[in-house]
């Protein structure tokens, strides 16, 4: 398959789980990892079956009510229904202890499971890496990771991938190993700086990466899919993906 035939890929965005079919059809065929912010929202999203949307099961670390709703049984059930566990992680806006308790439980239950994890780390980059050092997971994707160069190197050594967006600095984007890069919009957050008009709109990000990596735009698009194919193969996630995405990754 030509890189020009690959649809846009967005590995971290937010879409309301009651989105309509026509609204999804307006997203240009983009493959989107749609995060949820609470277990209740994740359970609602699990009822859907959309060929281009991978619905996550999340507990956003900035939402205290979401953290208290995290249970071992709930995570075990989620890991059988969701390919993506996210948005999860740590945030500096709320107390650390409940966040760590929820994250450690999620990492424990998901150990060895065929899922990918989309991890938030605002203001807690070092503490998040400590948690992943104690409980590593082959499917860890660090969403909008604003750590230092040393922390990026540490995360890469742990096997982490990085979902990046156009609001990140050229310097930080250049620090991340090219083979670990995945695209995101984090829509609807920071639309002015990401320039994403919709979930899956990675046009400006791909322009930035084309200039930064000195690659043609088609090669950047192909790179995203090659990296995702490697990640899903090593985590045994590939058989669980929607058929259309499996075909796309099989051509990488």
Residue ranges of predicted features:
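Mid-domain alpha/beta scaffold segments of enzyme catalytic cores
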Residues: 1-252
């Amino acid at each position: 398959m030509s890189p020009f035939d690959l649809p846009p890929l967005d590995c971290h965005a937010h879409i309301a789980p009651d989105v309509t079919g026509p609204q999804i059809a307006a997203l240009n065929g983009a493959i989107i990892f749609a995060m949820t912010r609470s277990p209740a929202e994740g359970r609602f999203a699990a009822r859907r079956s959309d060929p281009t949307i991978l619905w996550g099961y999340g507990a956003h670390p900035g939402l205290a009510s979401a953290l208290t709703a995290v249970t071992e049984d709930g995570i075990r059930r989620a890991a059988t229904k969701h390919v993506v566990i996210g948005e999860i992680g740590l945030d500096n806006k709320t107390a650390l202890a409940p966040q760590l308790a929820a994250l450690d439980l999620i990492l424990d239950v998901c150990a060895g499971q065929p899922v990918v994890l989309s991890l938030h780390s605002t203001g807690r980059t070092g503490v998040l890496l400590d948690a992943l050092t104690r409980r590593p997971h082959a499917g860890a994707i660090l969403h909008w990771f604003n750590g230092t160069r040393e922390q990026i190197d540490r995360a890469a050594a742990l096997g982490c991938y990085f979902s990046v967006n156009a609001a990140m600095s050229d310097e930080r984007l250049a620090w991340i190993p090219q083979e670990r890069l995945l695209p995101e919009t984090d829509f609807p957050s920071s639309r002015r700086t990401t320039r994403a008009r919709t979930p899956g709109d990675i046009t400006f990000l791909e322009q930035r990466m084309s200039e930064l990596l000195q690659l043609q735009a088609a090669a950047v698009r192909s790179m995203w899919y090659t990296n995702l194919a490697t990640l899903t193969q090593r985590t045994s996630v590939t058989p669980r993906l929607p058929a259309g995405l499996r075909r796309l990754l099989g051509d990488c």
